[in-house]
Amino acid sequence: MGQVGFGQPDDGIIQMAYVVADLRAAIGQWIERLRVGPWFVLEHFTGEHPVYRGQPSGAAVKLAMGFAGHMNIELIQENNNAPSVYREVIERRGYGFHHFGVATWNFDAAVAQYEREGYALAFRAAVPSGGRVGYMDTTAVLPGFTELIELGGAFEEVFGRFYRASIAWDGKDAIRSFI
């Protein structure tokens, strides 16, 4: 097992994600209460070729990423009410923790392993960093989904840029563009 550029283990947890009702308000609380920042915001995300529970997905979200130490934090707000892994959690228990992000160099093998263990692939899509993500439904045994995040492509550049910005962040320029 190695490490990704921001210090977390590859094939380990690199991200904690939360669904929120109001992205800007949530960012404000993370900055004020937890001193996490800066935040990189993507106003509209659907993924490329998104599939939810075996069907094409029309779900759209806005999201923000920041770092607390070496851990990536993702905040997610729905842009619509389309069926999605986000809507599932909100309807089941409200806003709050949603998923663990786990890095993997071998995405297909990781998905297959989870499926062999009985966990369904609830959502999959290609992402702007050039990789793929897959949300495995681990909600029966963990407090949320497990998102498999494919390493490679522009992953290190994108996440590395966010991480480097968080080191000795002075509280200025708290909200920045994701792209």
Give short role names for the model-derived ranges.
Residues 12, 128-132:
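Short acidic/glycine-enriched loop/turn segments that link adjacent beta-strands
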Residues 1-14, 18-41, 53-120, 137-179:
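Glyoxalase I/VOC metalloenzyme domain signal
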Residues 46-50:
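Short, charge-patterned binding micro-sites
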Residues 44-45, 80, 128-129:
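Conserved beta-strand edge residues that scaffold enzyme active sites
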